[in-house]
Amino acid sequence: AYFYYLVKAMVEAGKKMGFEESLATLLVKQTMLGSFHLINNADKSLDDLIKAVASKGGTTEAALREFEAGDLSKTLQTGILAAERRAKELSKG
């Protein structure tokens, strides 16, 4: 569900940009597929892949600045760790 949640947020942003939902969804899916391909096939770290597509002063860099300002990485990690805690609780019965 985590990835679906991210895709949904990206599609919603596309709709706010004026794209029809179907086109926004297609663009996000293509972006995800391209990203998966690079993660799966490139001999680079995730940090290197991020640097490779985040041009200085570019659009991706602007988005990443907003993600960092909102501490998106920490928020995602907190959610995943909450799921782990809940899984442990459920396994205890």
Predicted regions and their residues:
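Active-site-proximal catalytic alpha-helix in oxidoreductases
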Residues: A1-K15, L26-I39
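NAD(P)-dependent Rossmann-like dehydrogenase/reductase catalytic/cofactor-binding core
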Residues: T25-G93
